[in-house]
């Protein structure tokens, strides 16, 4: 979605609204670059209102979105102590009136998150994002062992149908390659 060049953004969208109530998305991705200390910014997976797929400041998509954003943040913008290291994965649900706070790396609006060392791996990395019976779960396979490690699980998450899936990435003064190799969406049978 971006090359290892400053001030870029890119995105990919499925423009058909989703009618599934319960779903799981598998992301096959690679984030890598030449810098060893300073790099950024990251990428996002989206499940949003179809009108919310325009370029903007939140990992390449617009702010004040309506729906779900799962952020794969590689750069700590927070000046001062943090309760977590980067790279960091977090989830945010917004009704269109909340902004993602880059200065605090979204920590005040996140549902949950985890540190995940997915950058500059010798192999591709995977993430699974599932929404089943109003439970949002994000898991990763960072070590390429074929085993999911839970990053976050949040109950009582309410997402409507007829939103769209997408992904976007952004670089600022710092950069990285953000390669999205595939997104696969599955309907989950749930009684």
Residue map of PLM features:
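Polar, low-complexity loop segments and adjacent catalytic/binding residues used for recognizing
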Residues: 1-191
């Amino acid at each position: 979605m971006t090359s290892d060049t400053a001030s870029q953004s890119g995105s990919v969208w499925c423009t058909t609204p989703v009618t599934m109530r319960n779903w799981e998305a598998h992301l096959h991705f690679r984030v890598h670059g030449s810098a060893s200390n300073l790099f950024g910014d990251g990428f996002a997976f989206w499940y949003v209102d179809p009108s919310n797929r325009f370029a903007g400041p939140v990992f390449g998509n617009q702010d004040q979105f309506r729906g779900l954003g799962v952020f794969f943040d590689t750069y700590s913008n927070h000046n001062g102590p943090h309760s977590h290291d980067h790279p960091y994965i977090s989830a945010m649900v917004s009704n269109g009136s909340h902004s993602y706070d880059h200065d605090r790396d979204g920590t005040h609006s996140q549902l949950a998150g985890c540190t995940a060392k997915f950058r500059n791996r010798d192999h591709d990395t995977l993430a699974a994002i599932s929404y089943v019976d109003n439970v949002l779960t994000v898991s990763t396979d960072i070590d390429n062992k074929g085993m999911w490690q839970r990053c976050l699980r949040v109950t009582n998450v309410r997402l409507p149908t007829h939103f769209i899936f997408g992904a976007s990435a952004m670089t600022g003064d710092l950069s990285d390659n953000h390669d999205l190799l595939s997104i696969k969406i599955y309907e989950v049978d749930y009684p």
